[in-house]
Amino acid sequence: MTPFDAKRPLQLNDQGQLRHFLSLDGLPRELLTEILDTADSFLEVGARAVKKVPLLRGKTVCNVFFENSTRTRTTFELAAQRLSADVISLNVSTSSTSKGETLFDTLRNLEAMAADMFVVRHSDSGAAHFIAEHVCPDVAVINGGDGRHAHPTQGMLDMLTIRRHKGSFENLSVAIVGDILHSRVARSDMLALKALGCPDIRVIGPKTLIPIGIEQYGVKVYTDLAEGLKDVDVVIMLRLQRERMAGGLLPSEGEFYRLFGLTTARLAGAKPDAIVMHPGPINRGVEIESAVADGKHSVILNQVTYGIAVRMAVLSMAMSGQNAQRQFDQENAQ
């Protein structure tokens, strides 16, 4: 674990409700299940002619993305809008941070504008945790991805995808394949799978892209794709994160595809009803071939749909927990 793994008291209020969503580390199975159940209920909202519920009416959600991600930002915006919140998305490249204003000052100014919640994405591990603990403790903070550390909403939308296609986690074999070393998605998925009772979690990749000590997550390590995929129920493919790599970690993208790219032939080693997932963006012909990404085993587009519902669940639950804590503090101050 990194030193930034979220402490339970910071993420939960005194009643055990979610108030920030920073990491899946330390969160109990019951809370993860509540998030999944709540997200399931929000899937129905997305099927309506009018895709809105009034749970966050009058609240302001600020998306503060210091690292680009069109898919994540858009699904958070849709989630907040479907909850009837007012949404501000800060374009950091044109904001005052590019003029020398610090992260601290930027967020304090947004808080002064009566923001109720921040969705933060940052290239530094621990950024969301720092903001929740030291910058804006009275504003609900949702981690939209921080460095290599965590991407908890992606982890939960992956769990919702698995649960809706496979039911219980307790008899599943799940393989996570690719650049494990640089992937915050891999870390969040491993934590969630372990907490939800998955007995067989496998990570597959070249030795140079598997972190030392990863066994502490309760996973089995494979450096041979065929061996690692044997009889699995779920395959989660990850892209090569070149932007986070130092030189020499792998020979070439072509070499990676030759050894670890998911093809129809290689997928045949998994169970016949295995599902294939990918957090995106997909690099076709690098970690996965088009015939698999677009084939009958792929649930990649389902992940996008479920992501909106999961983010609706997290936003609504964190806002409720933050409000409950504020009321609790006021009552105890009297």
UniProtKB/Swiss-Prot annotation:
Pfam families: OTCace, OTCace_N
UniProt enzyme class: transferase
Pathway in which this enzyme or protein is active: Pyrimidine metabolism; UMP biosynthesis via de novo pathway; (S)-dihydroorotate from bicarbonate: step 2/3
Binding site for carbamoyl phosphate: R71, T72, R121, H151, Q154, G280, P281
Source taxon at top rank: Bacteria
GO (cellular component) term, any one: cytosol
GO MF entries: amino acid binding; aspartate carbamoyltransferase activity
Binding site for L-aspartate: K99, R184, R239
KW Transferase (keyword) present: yes
Subunit (UniProt): Heterododecamer (2C3:3R2) of six catalytic PyrB chains organized as two trimers (C3), and six regulatory PyrI chains organized as three dimers (R2).
Family as reported in the entry's similarity comment: Belongs to the aspartate/ornithine carbamoyltransferase superfamily. ATCase family.
Descriptive protein name: Aspartate carbamoyltransferase catalytic subunit
Gene symbol of the encoding locus: pyrB
